[in-house]
A protein has these predicted regions:
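Hydrophobic, membrane-embedded alpha-helices of multi-pass small-molecule transporters
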Residues: 15-25, 94-98, 171-180, 188-257, ...
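Membrane-water interface regions at transmembrane-helix termini and the short interhelical loops
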Residues: 67-74, 137-159, 223-226, 337-349, ...
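Extracellular/periplasmic helix-exit of transmembrane alpha-helices
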Residues: 245-275
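Select transmembrane alpha-helical segments in multipass membrane proteins
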Residues: 9-20, 45, 82-96, 131-135, ...
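Membrane-interface loop-to-helix entry segments
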Residues: 144-174, 240, 350-362, 381-391
Length: 467
């Protein structure tokens, strides 16, 4: 079967690229760039360069790495070892699915969209208002996610253009009507702008999300006629490039918006929520509050839809005795329950969880890309690099949980940082692992064929199977 031409390949990848952009652009992506723009002052360029590197390029690389395995995160994790191949995907899917991210995005939509509109209409915040919001939001997300084979069409064709139009309106009017403000860079934005931008990019959670969305992307491309491994990788790169370009443009627009919006910014400010609210209300008045709410709802809804479908696809793959729709319903029920606890309760687990999982995920992606260049299949490199990153990442997680003893001990070396201290040791471990693989012959010896397994059918069934 012949593969599509270059022009048709772009046309095939466009809807999937729009879908991927919409899935990535969640609440976290919306609230951080304005803060970076306002807090960076004259350090705007290095701060945004760091943010785009980790918030755009790294998720793109992760999606491509997932496509090279042909098995999603399950296939990548199994290269480290069978136990890791079971535990790591489950932990990632739980964190980005029912136990954290879906509930978080639901409550963020309430805090930034539903609640301000209700207050505009004279209603006050209450548990009942949160319950109604969560019920409607989860109901709509569940309804869309029930048909993952049409996910690209529904998300890419309708929600993404609406989201982009609303963002263009808010950013355009604010930039044109508001004069630029002279602000000095504050706190870490002044002392270490590039690293601060890199760290802020981590907070989007898009690297973890990319390990999940990769399955949805590959399934969408397969349904559109790209079947060979080479065509799938090429289609993934094209789709990811489209999503990355849109993300970069939106991030820069929101960051510029932050430079032109009045608001009190200190080193302790955590997000750009107030900046966005001020921009909407000051430039568009009452209607601006409604437009801002619509942007947040669309951003959160598209993310929730993708996370629900991806979790159900993974769970159906792991436990095929339970149908896709039942897995989806179970995820929605758990997320519904947690979301009604409120945003503050949910965010308490965010820091330690991210610091623990991010080093594992980034190290796994890095070795996978090196492995793609090797004639054979790396073995020691996976174990050395991922294990080192995970151990040191656990130190950061413990610190985020409130115990800084191990971190202080490592800080005496003068080489440790809670946010990025694991990177250099992991790279050194990767080098050691590659040397060991070269000496053992694994670098140049093709991996033996593996017997068919449920994991090897992950891509085919994860997001497309329904019973």
């Amino acid at each position: 079967m012949s593969q599509p031409s270059s022009r048709s390949a772009v046309g095939t990848s466009l809807p999937t690229g729009l879908m991927l952009f919409a899935l990535f652009f969640g609440a976290g992506n919306l609230i951080f760039p304005p803060l970076l723009g306002a807090a960076s002052g004259r350090s705007f360029i290095p701060v945004m360069a760091g943010f785009i590197a980790t918030g755009v390029l790294m998720p793109l690389i992760t999606v491509v790495a997932v496509s090279t395995s042909g098995e999603g995160i399950l296939g990548l994790a199994r290269r480290v070892g069978p136990r890791f191949g079971t535990v790591m995907p489950l932990a990632v899917y739980l964190a980005i699915g029912p136990l954290y991210a879906i509930a978080r995005v639901t409550t963020v939509a309430y805090e930034l969209a539903t609640r301000p509109v209700l207050e505009l209409w004279g209603f006050h915040d209450s548990r009942l208002a949160l319950l109604v919001h969560v019920t409607v939001f989860m109901g709509v997300s569940f309804s869309i996610a029930r048909s993952p084979s049409r996910l690209a069409d529904r998300v890419g064709r309708w929600l993404t253009p609406a989201l982009l139009a609303l963002l263009a309106l808010l950013c355009g009017v604010t930039i044109l009507m508001s004069p630029g403000m002279e602000r000095e860079a504050i706190g870490p934005y002044a002392s270490d702008p590039l690293t601060t931008g890199l760290t802020q990019g981590y907070l989007t959670m898009d690297v973890l999300a990319a390990t999940v969305f990769g399955i949805v992307v590959i399934t969408s491309l397969r349904e559109r006629g790209l079947t060979s491994p080479r065509a799938l990788v090429r289609g993934t790169i094209l789709s990811g490039g489209i999503a990355a370009a849109l993300l970069g443009l939106v991030y820069i627009g929101l960051a510029v918006l932050g430079t032109r919006t009045r608001g009190q910014i200190t080193a302790d400010t955590k997000d750009g929520t107030e900046l966005l609210r001020n921009a909407a209300s000051s430039t568009l008045g009452t209607s601006g509050v409604v437009i801002f709410a619509a942007i947040v709802i669309l951003a959160c809804l598209t993310t929730a839809v993708g996370l629900l479908a991806s979790w159900a696809g993974y769970a159906y793959t792991a436990w095929p005795a339970v149908s896709f729709n039942r897995q989806l319903a179970a995820c929605a029920i758990v997320s519904f329950t947690l979301a009604n606890l409120g945003l503050s309760a949910i965010l308490k687990i965010a820091g330690p969880l991210l610091f623990l999982l991010y080093p594992f995920a980034i190290a796994l992606v890095a070795v996978t890309l090196v492995d793609a260049l090797a004639p054979g299949r790396l073995r020691a490199a996976y174990r050395w690099c991922v294990t080192t990153a995970g151990i040191l990442g656990s130190v950061s997680a413990i610190t985020a949980a409130g115990w800084d003893g191990p971190s202080k001990l490592l800080a005496r070396t003068g080489l440790w940082s809670d946010s990025t201290g694991w990177i250099l040791p992991a790279l050194l471990a990767l080098g050691i692992g590659i040397v060991l693989d070269v000496r053992s012959g694994a670098w140049s010896t093709p991996a033996p064929g593996e017997p068919p397994s449920q994991v090897q059918h992950d891509v085919e069934h994860a997001a497309a199977s329904q019973l």
